[in-house]
């Protein structure tokens, strides 16, 4: 990926501001919808993935990300699916890291299930990645296999070990699942904090058909927080990493605990994020079906002006917020899966 321009600070005329005055500075990009696990709250076991020919090339993803950086994005997170299963994805990460060197980008990071981390951790650090999120819902090997349908937790643990050895800061993301891992959260938190890792808890979101009712999985984090407050001293902290989590300090462990609550207390009022799928579809809101095709303008011209115009039109339609609903009749609020949208 040579010959691609480097960027400097976005001019005010290019910055993205939505109709509600929110400046867009955070881009999440799904580099693939594929994953080597099948977490039951995320996708069905017999998930049909997109034809590889439908995906943007790595060069196109680089150009698209660079266009958003030119328009004021300061934080870029690569997601999936599982981003590290995309062939040659490290060449994309290394190329995007040039924007860290110019100062146009403050942070380049990714969310991963950890299965490939042992292989890539050192190279990620070498590319300028400083911290990563690892999705891990349990410490129990049998329960991990149940949730992921076939995953080996030892691979994830080896990946976390490799990431910390490489000097990467690791944050653990865990989806709170009713009657499955909710009573394990204290031990998961103490384990994470004991290894100098923050833990962020996430409510189940009604995205995509998974073949079962999410009402059976959904646990309001307000209930879980109240339960934890009976065991630990939780002190609110104003410590945002640019995402939707609200953090507390756990006095007994000294660590941070985050809550992402799209169902019980959405985070729309401060939303600074948009998402791009691996096919070049721009979603300005996680909870709405509305989307804009960026692949067409990307391929229509070697220049970026048409792409900028399409992005600006989409940002101008960004909704004020979403209202997710867990439907007992097993109908998702949003038809697309999180693995396609970019988790």
UniProtKB/Swiss-Prot annotation:
UniProt-listed HAMAP family: MoaA_B (MF_01225_B)
Record field: catalytic activity: GTP + AH2 + S-adenosyl-L-methionine = (8S)-3',8-cyclo-7,8-dihydroguanosine 5'-triphosphate + 5'-deoxyadenosine + L-methionine + A + H(+)
Role, per record: Catalyzes the cyclization of GTP to (8S)-3',8-cyclo-7,8-dihydroguanosine 5'-triphosphate.
Protein's recorded name: GTP 3',8-cyclase
Keywords: 4Fe-4S, GTP-binding, Iron, Iron-sulfur, Lyase, Metal-binding, Molybdenum cofactor biosynthesis, Nucleotide-binding, S-adenosyl-L-methionine
Cross-referenced NCBIfam families: moaA (TIGR02666)
GO molecular function: 4 iron, 4 sulfur cluster binding; cyclic pyranopterin monophosphate synthase activity; GTP 3',8'-cyclase activity; GTP binding; metal ion binding; S-adenosyl-L-methionine binding
Residues engaged in binding GTP: 28, 77, 111, 171, 273-275
Keyword Iron found: yes
Alphabetical list of Gene3D superfamilies matching this protein: Aldolase class I
Free-text comment on the cofactor: Binds 2 [4Fe-4S] clusters. Binds 1 [4Fe-4S] cluster coordinated with 3 cysteines and an exchangeable S-adenosyl-L-methionine and 1 [4Fe-4S] cluster coordinated with 3 cysteines and the GTP-derived substrate.
Lineage start: Bacteria, Pseudomonadati, Pseudomonadota, Alphaproteobacteria, Hyphomicrobiales
Organism the protein comes from: Nitrobacter hamburgensis (strain DSM 10229 / NCIMB 13809 / X14)
Domain Radical SAM core: 19-244
Quaternary structure, from the entry: Monomer and homodimer.
Gene: moaA
Binding sites annotated in the UniProt record for S-adenosyl-L-methionine: 41, 81, 135, 205
Sequence positions that bind [4Fe-4S] cluster 2: 268, 271, 285
Cofactor(s), by name: [4Fe-4S] cluster
Family as reported in the entry's similarity comment: Belongs to the radical SAM superfamily. MoaA family.
